[in-house]
Regions:
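Extended hydrophobic leader/signal-anchor segments used for secretion and membrane insertion
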Residues: 1-164
Length: 164
């Protein structure tokens, strides 16, 4: 994962070194930086946000969560020291339900206070998208919440990836 505060990111040229640390320790520090008012850039790890964010290729810029809503992709602590970057699919009172774009059925839950960061920007295939911009909102709205369609589209996506 790549982590730099917003100020450091602007000063660093395109080529940056990256280091890998255990998520429980690393993301605790990320959460501290965000709570202090910094934006943090992370390289995506894992496939749970496919097809929109790819493992080790894409990056996310995280910021303080503010008011989150259904459809937002957030970094949340779902158990002590266990963090996920997934999309909010429902909010009922203080209970937030999350699901990765690449997950067909599985969901996670946390409390509103456990949402550590919101997405400010996404860097996909080297191109920057605002999380509040039309392109990302369009992607988010098009991605079906219906399990069967999600399963079929993810299967097609995986098959196409094999033939590249």
């Amino acid at each position: 994962m790549l982590c730099r505060s917003d100020k450091a990111m602007r000063q660093v040229p395109h080529k940056t070194a990256s280091i890998e640390l255990p998520n429980d320790k690393f993301l605790k520090e990320v959460r501290t930086l965000i709570a202090a008012g910094h934006d943090v850039t992370l390289r995506v790890r894992g496939v749970s946000m496919r097809p929109f964010l790819e493992d080790r290729r894409d990056q996310i810029v995280l910021t303080q969560p503010g008011v989150v809503k259904v459809g937002d992709a957030v970094l949340a602590e779902i158990a002590p020291g266990k963090y996920v970057y997934h999309r909010i699919i429902s909010i009922e009172g203080d209970k937030v339900t999350l699901r990765g774009d690449g997950n067909v059925y599985g969901t996670e839950q946390c409390r509103l206070e456990d949402v550590a960061a919101a997405t400010k920007e996404l860097i996909r295939k080297g191109r920057s998208y605002s999380a509040q911009g039309k392109a990302w909102r369009y992607y988010s709205a098009l991605w079906p919440s219906w399990s069967f369609a999600r399963r079929v589209l993810l299967k097609l996506y995986r098959m196409l990836k094999l033939y590249k």
